[in-house]
Amino acid sequence: MDFDDHDDGDEEMPPMPVSSSYETPPQHGLAGGGMAPKPPGEIGSHVKGPSCGGGRYRECLKNHAVGIGGHAVDGCGEFMAAGEEGTIDALRCAACNCHRNFHRKESESLAGEGSPFSPAAVVPYGATPHHQFSPYYRTPAGYLHHHQHHMAAAAAAAAAAAGGHPQRPLALPSTSHSGRDDGDDLSGMVGPMSAVGPLSGMSLGAGPSGSGSGKKRFRTKFTQEQKDKMLAFAERVGWRIQKHDEAAVQQFCDEVGVKRHVLKVWMHNNKHTLGKKLP
Protein backbone atom coordinates (compact mmCIF):
# COMPACT_ATOMS: atom_id res chain seq x y z
CA MET A 1 0.00 0.00 0.00
CA ASP A 2 1.37 3.39 -0.97
CA PHE A 3 1.23 5.90 1.89
CA ASP A 4 2.83 8.89 0.15
CA ASP A 5 -0.40 9.73 -1.68
CA HIS A 6 -2.64 9.63 1.43
CA ASP A 7 -2.88 12.10 4.26
CA ASP A 8 -3.74 11.23 7.84
CA GLY A 9 -5.99 13.57 9.83
CA ASP A 10 -3.67 13.56 12.85
CA GLU A 11 -0.49 13.94 10.80
CA GLU A 12 0.05 17.11 8.79
CA MET A 13 2.07 16.47 5.70
CA PRO A 14 4.86 19.07 5.39
CA PRO A 15 4.82 21.15 2.22
CA MET A 16 6.94 19.97 -0.62
CA PRO A 17 10.05 22.08 -1.33
CA VAL A 18 9.40 24.96 -3.67
CA SER A 19 12.99 25.58 -4.67
CA SER A 20 14.18 24.09 -7.90
CA SER A 21 17.38 23.00 -6.20
CA TYR A 22 15.41 20.37 -4.24
CA GLU A 23 14.09 18.70 -7.38
CA THR A 24 15.85 15.88 -9.15
CA PRO A 25 14.89 14.20 -12.42
CA PRO A 26 13.66 10.60 -12.15
CA GLN A 27 16.29 7.89 -12.46
CA HIS A 28 15.90 4.99 -14.85
CA GLY A 29 17.46 1.57 -14.75
CA LEU A 30 18.50 1.55 -11.10
CA ALA A 31 20.51 -1.53 -10.24
CA GLY A 32 22.84 -2.70 -7.52
CA GLY A 33 26.06 -0.94 -8.25
CA GLY A 34 28.47 1.52 -6.68
CA MET A 35 27.11 4.12 -4.33
CA ALA A 36 26.89 7.49 -6.11
CA PRO A 37 26.11 10.29 -3.63
CA LYS A 38 24.08 13.21 -4.87
CA PRO A 39 24.84 16.85 -4.24
CA PRO A 40 23.48 18.24 -0.95
CA GLY A 41 21.06 20.48 -2.87
CA GLU A 42 19.04 17.57 -4.31
CA ILE A 43 16.86 14.95 -2.65
CA GLY A 44 14.81 12.08 -3.97
CA SER A 45 11.40 13.70 -3.71
CA HIS A 46 10.00 11.49 -6.47
CA VAL A 47 10.18 8.27 -4.46
CA LYS A 48 6.70 6.99 -3.74
CA GLY A 49 7.26 4.63 -0.83
CA PRO A 50 9.76 3.12 1.55
CA SER A 51 10.42 0.21 -0.76
CA CYS A 52 10.56 2.09 -4.07
CA GLY A 53 13.97 2.82 -5.54
CA GLY A 54 16.03 1.59 -2.57
CA GLY A 55 18.95 3.54 -1.18
CA ARG A 56 19.45 5.41 2.07
CA TYR A 57 18.40 8.87 3.17
CA ARG A 58 21.17 10.99 4.59
CA GLU A 59 21.19 14.48 6.13
CA CYS A 60 18.06 16.60 6.39
CA LEU A 61 17.99 19.53 3.98
CA LYS A 62 14.82 21.22 5.19
CA ASN A 63 15.27 25.01 5.32
CA HIS A 64 14.00 26.21 8.70
CA ALA A 65 14.82 29.86 7.95
CA VAL A 66 12.92 30.25 4.69
CA GLY A 67 10.48 32.61 6.41
CA ILE A 68 13.22 35.20 6.99
CA GLY A 69 14.94 34.71 3.64
CA GLY A 70 17.84 32.70 5.04
CA HIS A 71 18.96 29.10 5.04
CA ALA A 72 19.39 26.99 8.16
CA VAL A 73 19.18 23.24 8.63
CA ASP A 74 18.57 21.31 11.84
CA GLY A 75 21.76 19.25 11.69
CA CYS A 76 20.11 15.83 11.37
CA GLY A 77 22.72 13.58 9.78
CA GLU A 78 20.63 10.60 8.65
CA PHE A 79 16.98 9.66 8.30
CA MET A 80 15.65 7.37 11.05
CA ALA A 81 12.14 6.06 10.55
CA ALA A 82 9.85 6.79 13.48
CA GLY A 83 7.72 3.68 12.87
CA GLU A 84 7.71 0.28 11.29
CA GLU A 85 7.72 -0.09 7.51
CA GLY A 86 4.23 0.06 6.16
CA THR A 87 2.98 2.66 8.62
CA ILE A 88 2.62 6.40 8.17
CA ASP A 89 5.31 6.99 10.80
CA ALA A 90 7.84 5.24 8.59
CA LEU A 91 7.94 8.38 6.44
CA ARG A 92 8.73 10.64 9.40
CA CYS A 93 12.23 11.04 10.86
CA ALA A 94 12.44 10.21 14.54
CA ALA A 95 15.38 12.60 15.03
CA CYS A 96 14.19 15.81 13.36
CA ASN A 97 10.46 15.01 12.89
CA CYS A 98 10.71 15.98 9.20
CA HIS A 99 9.28 14.04 6.26
CA ARG A 100 11.61 11.64 4.52
CA ASN A 101 11.51 13.69 1.33
CA PHE A 102 13.47 16.46 3.07
CA HIS A 103 16.44 14.12 3.50
CA ARG A 104 19.03 13.67 0.78
CA LYS A 105 18.64 10.31 -0.87
CA GLU A 106 21.71 8.22 -1.55
CA SER A 107 20.57 5.88 -4.30
CA GLU A 108 22.25 2.96 -6.01
CA SER A 109 23.02 3.47 -9.69
CA LEU A 110 25.36 2.11 -12.31
CA ALA A 111 28.50 4.12 -12.88
CA GLY A 112 28.09 3.82 -16.65
CA GLU A 113 24.61 5.31 -16.77
CA GLY A 114 23.95 8.96 -17.39
CA SER A 115 24.16 11.23 -14.41
CA PRO A 116 20.71 12.29 -13.12
CA PHE A 117 22.02 15.75 -12.33
CA SER A 118 23.87 18.36 -14.30
CA PRO A 119 27.68 18.67 -14.00
CA ALA A 120 27.23 22.22 -12.72
CA ALA A 121 25.45 20.87 -9.65
CA VAL A 122 28.41 18.70 -8.63
CA VAL A 123 30.21 20.07 -5.59
CA PRO A 124 33.98 19.41 -5.61
CA TYR A 125 35.38 17.28 -2.86
CA GLY A 126 36.18 19.33 0.22
CA ALA A 127 34.25 22.39 -1.01
CA THR A 128 31.39 23.92 0.93
CA PRO A 129 28.13 24.15 -1.06
CA HIS A 130 26.92 27.72 -1.49
CA HIS A 131 23.19 27.96 -2.05
CA GLN A 132 22.26 30.45 -4.73
CA PHE A 133 18.87 31.32 -3.29
CA SER A 134 20.19 32.61 0.03
CA PRO A 135 23.13 34.77 1.16
CA TYR A 136 23.55 32.44 4.15
CA TYR A 137 24.82 28.88 4.17
CA ARG A 138 25.73 26.37 6.85
CA THR A 139 29.00 24.48 6.90
CA PRO A 140 29.13 20.76 7.71
CA ALA A 141 30.02 21.69 11.28
CA GLY A 142 26.68 23.49 11.64
CA TYR A 143 27.87 27.11 11.89
CA LEU A 144 25.98 29.80 10.04
CA HIS A 145 28.06 32.05 7.80
CA HIS A 146 27.31 35.00 5.55
CA HIS A 147 28.06 34.34 1.92
CA GLN A 148 28.74 38.00 1.00
CA HIS A 149 31.74 38.12 3.35
CA HIS A 150 33.41 35.24 1.51
CA MET A 151 32.53 36.75 -1.85
CA ALA A 152 34.14 40.06 -0.88
CA ALA A 153 37.27 38.28 0.36
CA ALA A 154 37.51 36.27 -2.86
CA ALA A 155 37.07 39.42 -4.96
CA ALA A 156 39.82 41.20 -3.02
CA ALA A 157 42.18 38.25 -3.48
CA ALA A 158 41.43 38.15 -7.22
CA ALA A 159 42.07 41.88 -7.56
CA ALA A 160 45.39 41.55 -5.75
CA ALA A 161 46.41 38.65 -8.00
CA ALA A 162 45.42 40.52 -11.16
CA GLY A 163 47.38 43.59 -10.14
CA GLY A 164 50.65 41.69 -10.09
CA HIS A 165 52.25 43.88 -7.41
CA PRO A 166 51.28 44.87 -3.87
CA GLN A 167 50.29 48.36 -2.92
CA ARG A 168 53.23 50.67 -2.37
CA PRO A 169 53.69 51.74 1.25
CA LEU A 170 53.46 55.37 2.19
CA ALA A 171 56.70 57.29 2.25
CA LEU A 172 57.83 58.18 5.76
CA PRO A 173 59.93 61.23 6.65
CA SER A 174 63.64 60.61 6.63
CA THR A 175 65.41 60.77 9.99
CA SER A 176 68.93 60.45 8.64
CA HIS A 177 69.24 64.10 7.56
CA SER A 178 70.61 66.02 10.52
CA GLY A 179 73.07 68.43 8.90
CA ARG A 180 70.96 71.58 8.74
CA ASP A 181 72.33 75.01 8.22
CA ASP A 182 71.91 77.27 11.24
CA GLY A 183 71.38 80.24 8.97
CA ASP A 184 68.32 79.07 7.01
CA ASP A 185 64.69 79.69 7.86
CA LEU A 186 64.06 76.07 8.86
CA SER A 187 66.86 75.83 11.37
CA GLY A 188 66.63 75.90 15.13
CA MET A 189 64.54 72.73 15.42
CA VAL A 190 66.59 71.39 18.32
CA GLY A 191 66.24 71.10 22.06
CA PRO A 192 62.92 72.32 23.42
CA MET A 193 61.61 72.81 19.90
CA SER A 194 60.74 69.10 19.76
CA ALA A 195 57.94 69.68 22.27
CA VAL A 196 56.16 72.56 20.50
CA GLY A 197 52.86 72.39 18.66
CA PRO A 198 52.16 70.71 15.31
CA LEU A 199 52.97 73.79 13.24
CA SER A 200 56.57 72.71 12.67
CA GLY A 201 55.56 69.25 11.42
CA MET A 202 52.78 70.59 9.23
CA SER A 203 54.50 73.49 7.49
CA LEU A 204 58.18 72.63 7.71
CA GLY A 205 58.44 68.90 7.08
CA ALA A 206 61.19 66.64 8.37
CA GLY A 207 63.88 66.88 5.73
CA PRO A 208 64.38 66.71 1.99
CA SER A 209 62.18 63.59 1.70
CA GLY A 210 59.47 64.80 4.09
CA SER A 211 57.02 65.43 1.26
CA GLY A 212 57.62 61.99 -0.25
CA SER A 213 58.76 63.42 -3.63
CA GLY A 214 62.48 63.10 -2.94
CA LYS A 215 63.12 66.61 -4.27
CA LYS A 216 65.20 68.89 -2.06
CA ARG A 217 63.27 71.93 -0.91
CA PHE A 218 64.53 75.47 -1.23
CA ARG A 219 65.94 76.97 1.98
CA THR A 220 66.38 80.67 2.54
CA LYS A 221 69.85 81.76 3.61
CA PHE A 222 70.20 84.73 5.97
CA THR A 223 73.14 87.03 6.45
CA GLN A 224 74.34 87.85 9.93
CA GLU A 225 72.95 91.37 9.58
CA GLN A 226 69.50 89.98 8.73
CA LYS A 227 69.65 87.63 11.71
CA ASP A 228 70.51 90.46 14.08
CA LYS A 229 67.72 92.67 12.75
CA MET A 230 65.16 89.84 12.93
CA LEU A 231 66.26 89.03 16.48
CA ALA A 232 65.84 92.64 17.56
CA PHE A 233 62.44 92.90 15.87
CA ALA A 234 61.26 89.63 17.43
CA GLU A 235 62.21 90.87 20.90
CA ARG A 236 60.35 94.10 20.27
CA VAL A 237 57.08 92.39 19.26
CA GLY A 238 57.35 89.64 21.87
CA TRP A 239 58.20 86.78 19.45
CA ARG A 240 54.63 86.84 18.12
CA ILE A 241 53.09 88.62 15.14
CA GLN A 242 49.73 90.10 16.09
CA LYS A 243 47.15 91.94 14.03
CA HIS A 244 48.02 95.40 15.31
CA ASP A 245 51.66 94.79 14.28
CA GLU A 246 50.88 94.07 10.62
CA ALA A 247 52.00 97.49 9.40
CA ALA A 248 55.28 97.32 11.33
CA VAL A 249 55.90 93.77 10.15
CA GLN A 250 55.38 94.68 6.51
CA GLN A 251 57.67 97.71 6.83
CA PHE A 252 60.37 95.60 8.50
CA CYS A 253 60.17 92.93 5.80
CA ASP A 254 60.62 95.56 3.09
CA GLU A 255 63.66 97.00 4.87
CA VAL A 256 65.39 93.70 5.62
CA GLY A 257 64.46 91.97 2.37
CA VAL A 258 62.62 88.92 3.69
CA LYS A 259 59.08 87.72 3.18
CA ARG A 260 56.47 87.84 5.90
CA HIS A 261 55.95 84.07 6.15
CA VAL A 262 59.74 83.53 6.22
CA LEU A 263 60.02 85.92 9.16
CA LYS A 264 57.13 84.18 10.90
CA VAL A 265 58.76 80.74 10.49
CA TRP A 266 62.13 82.04 11.68
CA MET A 267 60.53 83.54 14.80
CA HIS A 268 58.70 80.31 15.51
CA ASN A 269 61.83 78.18 15.12
CA ASN A 270 64.06 80.38 17.28
CA LYS A 271 61.57 81.45 19.94
CA HIS A 272 62.64 78.69 22.36
CA THR A 273 66.36 78.92 21.58
CA LEU A 274 67.41 82.51 20.98
CA GLY A 275 64.57 83.92 23.04
CA LYS A 276 65.60 82.04 26.22
CA LYS A 277 69.27 82.99 25.92
CA LEU A 278 68.47 86.62 26.60
CA PRO A 279 68.50 87.74 30.28
Curated annotation (Swiss-Prot):
<keyword id="KW-0805">Transcription regulation</keyword>
<keyword id="KW-0804">Transcription</keyword>
<dbReference type="InterPro" id="IPR006456">
    <property type="entry name" value="ZF_HD_homeobox_Cys/His_dimer"/>
</dbReference>
<dbReference type="GO" id="GO:0003700">
    <property type="term" value="F:DNA-binding transcription factor activity"/>
</dbReference>
<keyword id="KW-0371">Homeobox</keyword>
<dbReference type="GO" id="GO:0050793">
    <property type="term" value="P:regulation of developmental process"/>
</dbReference>
<feature type="region of interest" description="Disordered">
    <location>
        <begin position="157"/>
        <end position="191"/>
    </location>
</feature>
<protein>
    <recommendedName>
        <fullName>Zinc-finger homeodomain protein 1</fullName>
    </recommendedName>
</protein>
<dbReference type="InterPro" id="IPR009057">
    <property type="entry name" value="Homeodomain-like_sf"/>
</dbReference>
<dbReference type="GO" id="GO:0000976">
    <property type="term" value="F:transcription cis-regulatory region binding"/>
</dbReference>
<keyword id="KW-0863">Zinc-finger</keyword>
<keyword id="KW-0479">Metal-binding</keyword>
<keyword id="KW-0539">Nucleus</keyword>
<feature type="region of interest" description="Disordered">
    <location>
        <begin position="1"/>
        <end position="47"/>
    </location>
</feature>
<keyword id="KW-0238">DNA-binding</keyword>
<feature type="site" description="Required for DNA-binding">
    <location>
        <position position="267"/>
    </location>
</feature>
<comment type="subunit">
    <text>Homo- and heterodimer with other ZFHD proteins.</text>
</comment>
<comment type="function">
    <text>Putative transcription factor.</text>
</comment>
<dbReference type="GO" id="GO:0005634">
    <property type="term" value="C:nucleus"/>
</dbReference>
<feature type="zinc finger region" description="ZF-HD dimerization-type; degenerate">
    <location>
        <begin position="57"/>
        <end position="106"/>
    </location>
</feature>
<keyword id="KW-0862">Zinc</keyword>
<dbReference type="GO" id="GO:0008270">
    <property type="term" value="F:zinc ion binding"/>
</dbReference>
<dbReference type="InterPro" id="IPR006455">
    <property type="entry name" value="Homeodomain_ZF_HD"/>
</dbReference>
<feature type="DNA-binding region" description="Homeobox">
    <location>
        <begin position="215"/>
        <end position="278"/>
    </location>
</feature>
<dbReference type="Pfam" id="PF04770">
    <property type="entry name" value="ZF-HD_dimer"/>
</dbReference>
<feature type="compositionally biased region" description="Acidic residues">
    <location>
        <begin position="1"/>
        <end position="13"/>
    </location>
</feature>
